[in-house]
Amino acid sequence: MEKANSFTKEQLIACGQGELLGANSPKLPIDNMLMVDRIVRINEDGGAFGKGEIIAELDINPTLWFFDCHFKGDPVMPGCLGLDAMWQLVGFYLGWEGAQGKGRALGVGEVKFTGQVLPDAKKVTYKLNIKRKIHRKLVMGIADATMEVDGREIYSATDLKVGIFSDTSTF
């Protein structure tokens, strides 16, 4: 059976509930912490390193929850939410490949913010290039990523690391 190469918001929510990739697969956050509305492309052999890529989007509108509290009178999307979205997508990628367990962000090499997401923006686009995949006792994905707002690159991150764990009680 061929794997899907794109996903809707409803499917991503189902992933957060353990219904899309399996009950024991890594889950996406749900509700306000899900920072992705759709995955428009995911594959195992594309991207800058030929090891996989993910292109995903988030629709922006002035009613998004974070604009009311970050900051009063000066609304801007928190940079950490864009970074978290990148980790979310690396974890999703590992689950899409068949990894089982709980996903956890393990680190990032370098992060640069060169712009901001304001309430009048229309769309954020995440572009992830998978650099390395480890499928042994430890399952881990490493990726480089960028985030664009309305076609302009504003964030970049190198060496985003996500691990998949069967037991997180001692993590």
UniProtKB/Swiss-Prot annotation:
Pathway listed: Lipid metabolism; fatty acid biosynthesis
Record's catalysed reaction(s): a (3R)-hydroxyacyl-[ACP] = a (2E)-enoyl-[ACP] + H2O; (3R)-hydroxydecanoyl-[ACP] = (2E)-decenoyl-[ACP] + H2O; (2E)-decenoyl-[ACP] = (3Z)-decenoyl-[ACP]
Annotated compartments: Cytoplasm
Gene3D superfamilies in alphabetical order: Hotdog Thioesterase
EC number: 4.2.1.59, 5.3.3.14
Disulfide linkage: none
Keyword list, A-Z: Cytoplasm, Fatty acid biosynthesis, Fatty acid metabolism, Isomerase, Lipid biosynthesis, Lipid metabolism, Lyase
Keyword hit for Lipid biosynthesis: yes
One biological process term in Gene Ontology: unsaturated fatty acid biosynthetic process
Keyword field contains Lipid metabolism: yes
InterPro entries linked to this entry: FabA, FabA_FabZ, HotDog_dom_sf
Protein name: 3-hydroxydecanoyl-[acyl-carrier-protein] dehydratase
Source species: Shewanella denitrificans (strain OS217 / ATCC BAA-1090 / DSM 15013)
Name of encoding gene: fabA
